[in-house]
């Protein structure tokens, strides 16, 4: 498959692979494509939050007046308040800084955003909140969002598709449920981490209990309850 095939799909796509699998080379190729906004620690160029958000549109001579409505829309969507705009980027929390990085790139209106292992120093609560914000960005701004991560369990609930990298190549790409349902043994053979929730559903199936494909613990509890209720009512 071509790298271009994963772009402009209006999906959230997870990119995973073992250490040394060649993730970085594949990600580098993605970054070279057109209309890619890259979110990483190199994004920060200014001390003041508002200046940072407007840095790239100034750098590339966008007309700020025409972008004011868009800036307000993005700031509102990302829940960046007025007080935060006047602060130093070095005095805000890591999760707030992450939102500032997104806003500064989003203002340039790229079609695709790539998050290159920047989410995962956050605690669980902050990470979950920000991943939910990415789902809103995808929906309301029609963006393709690519998340490179070391741990599939961190993002499984929030992604639509998955890319699995092995030996410097794209081993598998497609809908997350189909990838794990149709390629479970291959992924195991490659010793690539499988989401805990997928492992649980597979073990239940191996023991004769078929559960719906779900991607979060709340839905798993519901589907287990439905199945067990049916079982005990027989």
What is each model feature region?
Residues 74-90:
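Conserved ABC nucleotide-binding domain
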Residues 169-193:
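Conserved beta-strand-loop-alpha-helix hinge in the C-terminal portion
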């Amino acid at each position: 498959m071509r790298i271009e095939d994963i772009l402009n799909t209006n999906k959230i796509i997870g990119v995973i692979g073992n250490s040394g699998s060649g993730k970085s080379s594949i990600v580098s190729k993605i970054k070279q494509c057109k209309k890619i906004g890259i979110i990483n620690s190199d994004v920060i160029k200014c001390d003041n939050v508002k200046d940072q958000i407007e840095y790239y549109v100034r750098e590339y001579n966008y007309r700020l007046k025409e972008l004011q409505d868009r800036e307000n829309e993005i700031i509102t969507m990302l829940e960046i308040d007025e007080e935060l705009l006047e602060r130093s980027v070095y005095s805000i929390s890591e999760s707030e800084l992450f939102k500032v990085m997104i806003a500064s790139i989003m203002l340039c209106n790229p079609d695709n955003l790539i998050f290159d292992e920047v989410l995962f120093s956050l605690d669980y609560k902050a990470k979950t909140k920000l991943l939910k914000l990415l789902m809103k960005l995808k929906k309301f701004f029609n963006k393709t969002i690519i998340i490179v991560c070391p741990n599939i369990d961190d993002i499984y609930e929030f992604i639509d598709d998955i890319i699995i990298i092995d030996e410097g190549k794209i081993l598998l790409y497609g809908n997350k449920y189909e990838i794990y349902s149709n390629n479970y043994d291959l992924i195991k053979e490659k010793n690539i981490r499988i989401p805990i929730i997928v492992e649980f559903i597979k073990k239940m199936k191996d023991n004769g209990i078929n559960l719906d494909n779900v991607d979060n613990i709340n839905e798993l509890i519901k589907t287990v309850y439905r199945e067990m209720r049916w079982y005990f009512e027989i």
